[in-house]
């Protein structure tokens, strides 16, 4: 649907993002903005308008950044165009936030007036300040009886270090004070700079694949303008495409026919090649190929690797296509083909964390209708061989033999944790259990900010869940990779009837290996169905067996027909049965159910 484009002077445009910790009310505030500026009629309104993915609505979290263009009339009578981007709050998606911020001049830092500042709001806020944005703190949930605005304003100034005495307060749920937030943001956030008459220069902030339209790109126009029918040039590929549609989301997909400097909107050029318009690339017109490329985004490195395999081998090609389509939309996803003796052909995928992995697997299963099975996730280890070569190990099967390795190193994460004083002891105990080393501690009002260096393998698994449960949900975490450090690491193999099962192997610290091995074989014992012969499950480090359990055979009562009978007759029948079971064991193979592969993930420490 096309509509007459309102031409707004560049000084009346405001581009901003909303950043906050999980559950501090970003998406609800976005809903209120849309409602007040008449983006949608009341009947079209629903909670979390911008979280369009089913998964986002179910879990109540934002995964993808979404952009919206609204028109707002200020009390001074001027009309402003607001382009805002709703960003995710979860630590696994912080790269989405930094991408969104590149398109803005300002950011609204939403803080829950009852909960106060949390680690993720601090991390995202620093990202915004580094990129030179104007940060406007806002206190949300002011209608709650437990809201303490004075304490929270003090916390924002203490912990983050930005002026917050005049921070607007609002309740996104009831709509109280939201008008004031809009007024303040128009006054505080600077207008974009750019020359509408200069040659076109635009940054691709995000892109996704539509089966009918091809690649849809979300762009921020720095200079110049782009119209429907223009011939555009993608700088990195050097290819030209005819623009078929240009417009904005308000939040409905609305064609406007032209986008001008300072604006954020979508461009569709019928690009069918999945890699035709990479995120972070610059587009210009084919008549001005000399326009400089804008600085893109730094590539994010995956922190967790896991094998994903289709249950049905014939799904391998559709699976590859699905991953490629998902990768346009999710630049942090990495994958390469892998084969496993136990699971067949699949892909080794790299993710930013466990939540990211879960989301990707769930999106593949829902949106592309695939049945997938995953192997145990591992982090990337660094090994130095005796010849002096450095190799990176992202899967236990790639672990070289101990005789050729000089040094094994594991990744260390720097974790910043914010926790109320009364839970400090529990959190410290948890960090030390996870082989953490304390680096710093600051008391800020009622909150304590602690910094630990913890091995990445301990952080990405279930550290976040454990941290939440030992602090009743009050602690918050932000972490980033800092370096590799030498460590005593071993590979634990799982043998079933003497044969190694590659998909069940894991790499862990030598001190943990024994009890993790025992816990794993005990768990496997419950999950592998009983066979007609004994099944031995063993955990081994190299040639040394560290744990064993046996799934007992099902057996028929061969003595049932003997009644009184002679004892030697009974012995003969039992010996015959034993002989048969032995023969069966030599030729029998054991089916391992999917749950058994997942057991590796769930082994408690």
Swiss-Prot record:
SUPFAM superfamilies from the xrefs?
EF-G C-terminal domain-like, P-loop containing nucleoside triphosphate hydrolases
One Pfam family this sequence matches: EFG_C
The record's EC number reads 3.6.5.n1
Indicate how the chain sits in the lipid bilayer: Peripheral membrane protein
Biological processes annotated in GO? positive regulation of translation
Keywords, A to Z, come to:
Cell inner membrane, Cell membrane, GTP-binding, Hydrolase, Membrane, Nucleotide-binding, Protein biosynthesis
Can you say where in the cell this protein is located?
A: Cell inner membrane
Q: Which InterPro entries match?
A: EF-4, EFG_III/V, EFG_V-like, EFTu-like_2, G_TR_CS, LepA_C_sf, LepA_CTD, LepA_IV
Q: What class of enzyme is it?
A: hydrolase
Which GO molecular-function terms appear in the entry? Answer: GTP binding; GTPase activity; guanosine tetraphosphate binding; ribosome binding; translation elongation factor activity
Q: Detail which positions bind GTP.
A: 23-28, 140-143
* GO terms for cellular component: plasma membrane
Chief place where the protein resides: membrane
Task: Pinpoint the tr-type G domain residues.
Answer: 11-193
Under catalytic activity, the entry for this protein gives: GTP + H2O = GDP + phosphate + H(+)
The entry's function note states: Required for accurate and efficient protein synthesis under certain stress conditions. May act as a fidelity factor of the translation reaction, by catalyzing a one-codon backward translocation of tRNAs on improperly translocated ribosomes. Back-translocation proceeds from a post-translocation (POST) complex to a pre-translocation (PRE) complex, thus giving elongation factor G a second chance to translocate the tRNAs correctly. Binds to ribosomes in a GTP-dependent manner.
Family assignment from sequence similarity: Belongs to the TRAFAC class translation factor GTPase superfamily. Classic translation factor GTPase family. LepA subfamily.
Name by which UniProt lists this protein: Elongation factor 4
As recorded in Swiss-Prot or TrEMBL, the protein's gene is named lepA
